[in-house]
């Protein structure tokens, strides 16, 4: 086809020149056809009426051009064939029409067509056809402002009108599919609600909201699963509010709630309640949870409630006291359903819901279950409350990654004794003084201690179950408002909390279950923003980290601790930002001192010292990139060929640096592909090693600036060095065995591997029935 079209257009262009003289003679018809052209020329000056006459002229021209045959039958054929030409609205159709025409060819029609086009603007054959079809496709919509939209003021009307449909399609392409599907006009949402949503910064429904709206609005039971930070709260809040406001009757005092939303934590309940209140002014929204006085809540029930949000404990208390009536419920929402129906909450939830639910009754309230994680057991438990015809919306499905895709997942290997100091450095580099960070700890004690640790230079406060409810609310409000930059919390803050602009999430150790990791990491990278989640782990916790990777469908990028250079660079940027916040009135008081400093130290030295002090980076410890230990520097020894064993590197080090290097090197491990090794040396030994070492064609020694990819786990500290003929260090096996393998020695070989010690068992053996028992807190440094 393309070949035919090209050859056809070639022959047509040749035929055009030959037929020019013949086409100039006929007649009154030709004269009549050229009259609209003069009108078209006038239309190029911006007159809209001329534009519409041009559209008509083109339409008239189309059929007359397409009619092939003697002049006498032309009118009749024009009337018969006119409807067939009109529907043509695509360029493909125009190309298809040319083939048969050219087979019939050198008729008057083809010549006439070709003669007219060059006279207008020497364009290719398809151009006028595209113009006509583009205008026909626009229809009545284009009539509103054809002169302006289609650019008729341009001297080439055909080309400009040809661009109009293209311009429209480009505009359509610019609008993401999500925005098209989530446009408010697609849903029965009142103008009042739309205004309130826009005031909250919501200009269209997010995917989970768009896909669940009609299910919720039509009264169907629903299980919905979507990643954290995708707007699940509004997924049920918007349709329920529209439904209740649509059937709003007289608001009687003391009326019972029609909607009950249960949340696992007080903080989440408070937030859900606020989300409801922000998008309705007609309905009464109340939030009941523990740690607050009963009196105010009882008064709210006397006034009447339309939507009740709360935690299971306090709702159950009001039921038992006979103060709360749930018999009029029409809608029940379980937010974060996996935790809600967990062992600790299942009994309370069942006791609450049995008041409003009857066994196998179609009159039971609509039940909505929402969460980012839905284990299989959730579906089994949910069937007790849901109708058999329930709907399911899953925006995660079989996708391997369950965690938020807007979050970068990093992991740092660090002993618990160094953890607080390294976390302080991490916050400096990844968040800074102006950013917001949430640190998650496993215990209340850890959260309290870490928030008060001097290694964290930013203002930090803790949030956990032992803090009074009123103080918890003040703390969360302060963090939201940016009054302080670091929040150290237990799982209290892991679920559902929508805190804007959290730059960094730090997990002090891998959580016990993958769901916790997903929810914790989801506190950053929300509502389209990107974020970073850094998980700290010890050698003992590598298995737990691997489990998180496997079940959450993510891959941690193993990184080293921030280097001294990175810390200083980040700290200086922070200090410069802080200078911008100093008011001009305050600067005047320090000018005299500044001038004196400049005279004594010089401008650059004085300012550099001031920046160092402001940033708090007056002293920065070098740390190992392998295990984060302070006072060590990681070095890389690269080899141009694959190394058969690690002794190959030891031999080269000793040849150049002497036997004494044996005592200075720690934790040697292969690089990826065995094309070198990396190891730690004391900070004070680095200069001496650099002076003695000379690179060769095969060997190059450098100081590592970032953690390299490793072949496997590093050798045990203090067990990674020794002579090539036997194992040395604290994990001493029999001297006759190889350092790298598993020789059975007097104490059972290296405890890094598979040897059994007489009284204990292998340290790395994870079987609970073998070896000496160790306390959990000692093992994990808690």
UniProtKB/Swiss-Prot annotation:
Residues 1-184, 704-782 are annotated as: Disordered. It catalyses: ATP + H2O = ADP + phosphate + H(+). Residues 728-756 have a biased composition (Low complexity). One of its GO terms (cellular component) is nucleoplasm. ATP binds at residues 226-233. PROSITE patterns: HELICASE_ATP_BIND_1, HELICASE_CTER, Q_MOTIF. The modification Phosphoserine is found at residues 7, 13, 119, 145, 169, 563. Its EC number is 3.6.4.13. It is found in: Nucleus, Nucleolus; Nucleus, Nucleoplasm; Cytoplasm, Cytosol; Mitochondrion. GO terms for biological process: defense response to virus; innate immune response; positive regulation of canonical NF-kappaB signal transduction; positive regulation of myeloid dendritic cell cytokine production; positive regulation of transcription by RNA polymerase III; R-loop processing; response to exogenous dsRNA; response to virus. Acetylation inhibits the helicase activity. There is a cross-link at residue 114 (Glycyl lysine isopeptide (Lys-Gly) (interchain with G-Cter in SUMO1)). The helicase and foldase activities reside in two separate domains, the helicase in the N-terminus and the foldase in the C-terminus. This is Nucleolar RNA helicase 2. It comes from Rattus norvegicus (Rat).
């Amino acid at each position: 086809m393309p070949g035919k079209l090209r050859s056809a257009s070639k022959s047509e262009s040749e035929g055009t020149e030959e037929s020019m003289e013949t086409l100039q003679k006929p007649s009154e018809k030709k004269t009549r056809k050229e009259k609209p052209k003069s009108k078209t020329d006038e239309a190029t000056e911006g007159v809209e009426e001329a534009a519409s006459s041009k559209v008509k002229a083109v339409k008239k021209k189309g059929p007359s051009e397409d009619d092939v045959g003697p002049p006498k039958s032309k009118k009749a054929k024009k009337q018969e064939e006119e409807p067939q030409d009109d529907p043509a609205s695509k360029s493909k159709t125009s190309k298809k029409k040319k083939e048969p025409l050219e087979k019939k060819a050198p008729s008057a029609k083809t010549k006439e067509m070709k003669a007219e086009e060059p006279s207008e603007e020497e364009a290719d054959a398809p151009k006028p056809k595209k113009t006509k079809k583009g205008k026909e496709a626009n229809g009545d919509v284009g009539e509103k402002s054809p002169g302006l939209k289609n650019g008729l003021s341009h001297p080439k009307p055909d080309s400009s009108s040809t661009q109009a449909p293209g311009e429209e399609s480009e505009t359509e392409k610019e609008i993401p599919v999500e925005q098209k599907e989530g446009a408010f006009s697609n849903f029965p949402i009142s103008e009042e609600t739309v205004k309130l949503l826009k005031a909250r910064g919501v200009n269209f429904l997010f995917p989970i909201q768009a896909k669940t709206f009609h299910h919720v609005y039509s009264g169907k039971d629903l299980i919905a699963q979507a990643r954290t930070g995708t707007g699940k709260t509004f997924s049920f809040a918007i349709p329920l509010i529209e439904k209740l406001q649509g059937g709003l009757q007289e608001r009687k005092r003391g009326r019972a709630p029609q909607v009950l939303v249960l949340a696992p934590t007080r903080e989440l309940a408070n937030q859900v309640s606020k989300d409801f209140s922000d998008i309705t002014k007609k309905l009464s929204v109340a939030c009941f949870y523990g740690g607050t006085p009963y009196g105010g809540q009882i008064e709210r029930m006397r006034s009447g409630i339309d939507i009740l949000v709360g935690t299971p404990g306090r709702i159950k208390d009001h039921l038992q006291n006979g103060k709360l009536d749930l018999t009029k419920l029409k809608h029940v929402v379980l937010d974060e359903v996996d935790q809600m129906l967990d062992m600790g909450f299942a009994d309370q939830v069942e006791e609450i819901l049995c008041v409003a639910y009857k066994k196998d009754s179609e009159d039971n309230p609509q039940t909505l279950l929402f969460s980012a994680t839905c284990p299989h057991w959730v579906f089994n438990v949910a069937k007790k409350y849901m109708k058999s015809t329930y709907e399911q919306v899953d925006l995660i499905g079989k996708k391997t990654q369950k965690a938020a895709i807007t979050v970068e997942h990093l992991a740092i290997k660090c002993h618990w004794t160094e953890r607080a100091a390294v976390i302080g450095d991490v916050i400096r580099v990844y968040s800074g003084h102006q950013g917001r960070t949430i640190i998650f700890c496993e215990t209340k004690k850890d959260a309290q201690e870490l928030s008060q640790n001097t290694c964290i230079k930013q203002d930090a406060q803790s949030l956990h179950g032992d803090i009074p409810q009123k103080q918890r609310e003040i703390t969360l409000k302060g963090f939201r408002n940016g009054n302080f930059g670091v929040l150290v919390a237990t799982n209290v803050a892991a679920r559902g909390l929508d805190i804007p602009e959290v730059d960094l999430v730090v997990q002090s150790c891998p959580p016990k279950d993958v769901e916790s990791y997903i929810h914790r990491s989801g506190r950053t990278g929300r509502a389209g923003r990107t974020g970073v989640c850094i998980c700290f782990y010890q050698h003992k916790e590598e298995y737990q980290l691997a489990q998180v990777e496997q079940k959450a469908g993510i891959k941690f990028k193993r990184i080293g601790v921030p280097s001294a250079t990175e810390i200083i660079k980040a700290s200086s940027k922070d200090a410069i930002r802080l200078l911008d916040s100093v008011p001009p009135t305050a600067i005047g008081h320090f000018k005299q001192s500044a001038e004196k400093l400049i005279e004594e130290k010089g401008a650059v030295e004085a300012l550099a010292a001031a920046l160092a002090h402001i940033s708090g980076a007056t002293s920065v410890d070098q740390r190992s990139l392998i295990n984060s230990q302070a006072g060590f520097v990681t070095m890389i020894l690269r080899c141009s060929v694959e190394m058969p064993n690690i002794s190959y590197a030891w031999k080269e080090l000793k040849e150049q640096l002497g036997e004494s290097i044996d005592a200075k090197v720690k934790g040697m491990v292969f690089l990826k592909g065995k094309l070198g090794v990396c190891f730690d040396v004391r900070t004070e030994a680095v200069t001496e090693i650099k002076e003695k070492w000379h690179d060769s064609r095969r060997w190059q020694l450098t100081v590592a600036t970032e953690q390299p990819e490793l072949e496997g786990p590093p050798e045990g500290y203090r067990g990674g060095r020794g002579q090539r003929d036997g194992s040395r260090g604290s994990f001493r096996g029999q001297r006759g065995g190889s350092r790298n393998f598993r020789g059975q020695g007097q104490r059972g070989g290296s405890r890094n591997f598979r040897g059994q010690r007489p009284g204990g068992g292998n340290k790395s053996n994870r079987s609970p029935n073998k070896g000496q028992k160790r306390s959990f807190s000692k093992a994990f440094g808690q």
